[in-house]
């Protein structure tokens, strides 16, 4: 799910509920003090970000968007079971924020069962999510003083990185099962 502004309390309550549903959230900026979604380990959050000079060696130069005042996220859509045989794509002008739900003149389309459209939206969501998640992790680790480039995010030995992908309680295992299971 994408959020261009704030995350309304209705969505916060749903996202904070502990369950086994894997959910990815990408938002234009970090969570505000009034926003809380981090109670469930199956909610993976990424905030839009711009890495300054030297933040990541050997990456392409970052460029901002001079046209739009939303610095990182402009698309607004929600995907429910996007890899299933009956996906749900919700998209339109609404930001899923309180004003967009209650007072603004917004529109939304709900597309159900169109696997081609869901695949296209899911591909775009994962592209945007991965782009910002990497930057978000760099920012969080730097803020926590854990920005040692020798610490190694990628492990060389299979035995060092593979086990979490097969631990049923692990996010990595849930993600592996979701992306590799046959459509339902």
Question: What kind of region is each of these model predictions?
Answer:
Residues 1-5:
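Structural motif
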Residues 7-184:
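PLD/PLD-like phosphodiesterase catalytic module centered on the HKD motif
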